[in-house]
Amino acid sequence: MPRGRMGGRHGMSTEKAKDFKGTMKKLMGYLTQYKIGLLLVVIFAIGSTVFNIVGPKILGKATTELFHGLVSKVSGGSGIDFDKIAKILIGLMCLYVCSALFSFIQGYIMTGVSQKLTYRMRKEISEKIDRLPMGYFDKMTHGEILSRITNDVDTLSQSLNQSATQVITSVATIIGVLVMMLSISPLMTVIAILILPLSMGLIGMIVKRSQRYFKEQQEYLGYVNGQVEEVYGGHNIVKAFNKEDDVIDEFDRDNDRLYRSAWKSQFLSGMMMPIMQFVGNLGYVAVVILGGYLAIKKTIEVGDIQSFIQYVRNFTQPIQQVAQVANMLQSTAAASERVFEFLEEPEEEAAPENPVVLKNPEGAVEFEHVHFGYNPEHTIIHDFSVKVEPGQKIAIVGPTGAGKTTMVKLLMRFYDVSGGSIKVDGHDIREFDRGELRRMFGMVLQDTWLFKGSIEDNIRYGKLDATHEDVVKAADAAYAHRFIQTLPGGYGMELNEEASNVSQGQKQLLTIARAILADPKILILDEATSSVDTRTEVRIQKAMDNLMKGRTSFIIAHRLSTIRDADLILVMKEGDIVEMGRHEELLAKNGFYADLYNSQFEQTA
């Protein structure tokens, strides 16, 4: 099934492995803005860890005291000193309360840092979208872009929030526990440490395997999102052409790829914990055997054995957490790289230092030897030249693929010409600020774009500071006022997300009203009367006539009957102007335009 707007699978199988180090370096650069918060996180995380580390040693003293009391009671002594044990346990409880408080504070601060980073990245992505050239959106699917704003940023935030804290606590725990273990028994410490090389080797093997699958998981999630968005937006077309089975088959293929990559990545990451627990238990058994032997030899106390056993457990926990952190860092790096790739995409050329500003534009437009191709290997417009006087009505006609819509994109500087120049009032459009240039243009497209909101707000989009009276006046000039009054709520009626609660013709009248309100000097009308009934077409044509009065107008239409009164008709074929003149002149030539015109009437007949 054709993918329509979604396009192809760009780079799915050929994309290179992520640059883990480079991506994490960029992420660290982003985090420098929050260095004070991160410093506090480090301080409180270390403080919480230290209190936890000291706990087992103190608890070991209580165990030793209990053991000595039992021995004393058996041998006829004073027995167990419960007061002393109680004091030890109260002190231990205070330590754990402080540890919990510090942990809460560092968690609160780290959550704030991660959410601020999320907010900043989403803001930068939103701003970046406005600066990207149109060519980027032609090659990327909506789902892929949406995935970067939602899935990738969320993944980055969540994994960063968890991994950053665990890295700090794990490192602090390993160092602190090692010191406490050495203070109890260097020999037992050596036995416990011997598990590290085995653990690190296993972690490295699993991380290396899982890294590729995590990246594939993020990619395929974007493809699935894109297809769902596309099918939902065009579900009527899918049903009309009985393509439900094709859509389901295509979704199943994409979903199966997502399933396989997600299954492999999650399976490998799930293996880390059992393997690390097994290795930790081996060390635990070895320490228990050696500790019992040293206690018999009176080298250490019984309470020291208990403390050391807890330290061994606490020593293996950070190793297991390192495995989890390595897993989360892969997700962080995969999501971060996709976000950074988007933020580093080439932008539209910056505005010139001293851009041209026209206070009273006249609307003269000139194409001088324009050459253009969407890629350098394939030029679709060859040496296009024409001069348009202010207020003229110019029609551009030709078969599909002739380059008509491309001319509009060049006028608006959605793309820049490969050769030659386009001038407005004698100034190359590259000398203008893009925003200033586009303010001189008004567009009425076949694909009418209306947003969720009231009808009045949609019309006012052409001029945000317009009054209600201005909106009504523009709607009246666009022959939209009458039908708006018949709608429930009138100008206050809310359009839904697809604007499906008004007809196609009404949508076009609203976009014409929007253009009239904006009062541009140059108009671009792209097949604006297609897909509507004859009566509505007449009404739209009258509205357009009002809109075009005193304005330079470029009309792109396949219905040649609508552009008979054009001042100049440009006939395009394969990127070149093959004929030029008024309607009657072109018919008299009996050339390509006449063939197009006559073929439409033959089809109608």
What are these regions (language model features)?
Residues G4-M6, H10-E15, Q115, K123-S147, ...:
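Short intracellular "coupling" helices and adjacent cytoplasmic loop segments at the cytosolic face
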Residues T23, L31, M110, D130-I175, ...:
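Juxtamembrane loop-to-helix connectors within ABC transporter transmembrane domains
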Residues M28, I36-K61, L92, G107-T111, ...:
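Alpha-helical segments in transporter systems
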Residues Q33, G37-V50, K61, Q162-E216, ...:
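Transmembrane helices of ABC transporter permease
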Residues Q33-I36, M134-G135, V153-L160, A164, ...:
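An intracellular "coupling" helix at the cytosolic face of ABC transporter transmembrane type-1 domains
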Residues L38-F102, S183-L187, K298-V302:
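Transmembrane helix-loop-helix hairpins at lipid-water interfaces of multipass membrane proteins
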Residues M180-L194, K264, L268-E337, F342-L343:
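Helix-loop-helix
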Residues A351-P352, L358-A605:
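ABC-type nucleotide-binding domain
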